[in-house]
Amino acid sequence: MTARLFLALALAAAPALASLPLERVKLPPGFEITVFAADVKNARSMALGEKGWLFVSTRSAGNVYAIRHDGVKALETVTIASGLNMPNGVAMQGGALFVAEVNRVWRYDAIEASLPKAPAPVLVYDQYPTDRHHGWKFIRFGPDGWLYVPVGAPCNVCEREDPYASITRLKPDGSAMEVVARGVRNTVGFDWHPQTKELWFTDNGRDMMGDDVPPDELNHAPRPGMHFGFPFCHGGDAADPDFGRARRCAEFTPPAQRFGAHVASLGMRFYTGAMFPPEYRGQAFIAEHGS
């Protein structure tokens, strides 16, 4: 059996698609990579509906798309929302699509029953900061039923009050919000281990400390309330040149895994499927943007 990797691409025109050098992508034996959808400009995050529609967010384009497909390629792409403020985050729960802008979260109830026309959105929460610097949000529902929403630091490096530089969680009806993890500069990828149900997340390190420091991180948060160092300490052992005198690195939780500096570790997901070979199951897949 051939294992397929689908590439949802933000392409503006067919000529760009025709020239996409997929043959240059290095794959393990038995894997194949193909273009799944080409008309989803500025695609960022994805969420799969219960009836098979694929919902795709954007960052700068301000749109949210719904894609009808046959499991191999897109058949129809519908713009279900436009003019939003960096709607980077999408997540599904109970047949409803949740969309996160910079400072607020919307809910589209029973959306797949309404397509190709989207239902009117319901405002869930609008008390997140309005800063656009690291303000786009990747969102997911946790095993506890809460919606997890990161709030990035509004800077390269600075010390700000909650909820900046944190991962928060929000009740689906918006009735409560709380901080789960602190000292997180800018995470845009997290998941829960399929066996332990514990949270793991990537974090992007600060700039202007050099080409080789600090490392990007994969962090493990088995319980709420942990602090991962920002802005005082990076990578578990590198004191910040501006804020490091205030706190010691030993006070914070070090990363479970260090990556290269400035590789921009973004999406992160544990593989729980059955199509890939056994050695892939339960492993973390991490996408790096690169500097």
Language-model segments: residues:
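Residue-level detector of Asp-centered blade-edge/turn motifs that repeat once per structural unit
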Residues: L48-G52, M92-G95, F141-D144, H193-T196, ...
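Beta-propeller domain segments
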Residues: S19-P29, W136, A153-V157, A165, ...
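A short beta-strand motif characteristic of beta-propeller blades
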Residues: I33-A37, E76-A81, V122-Y128, S175-A181, ...
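Conserved beta-strand positions in repeat-built beta-propeller and related beta-rich domains
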Residues: D39, L48-G49, F55-N63, V99-R104, ...
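A short loop-to-beta-strand structural motif that recurs across blades of beta-propeller domains
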Residues: E23, N63-A66, A96, R104-W106, ...
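Beta-rich catalytic cores
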Residues: D39-N42, E50, S60, E76, ...
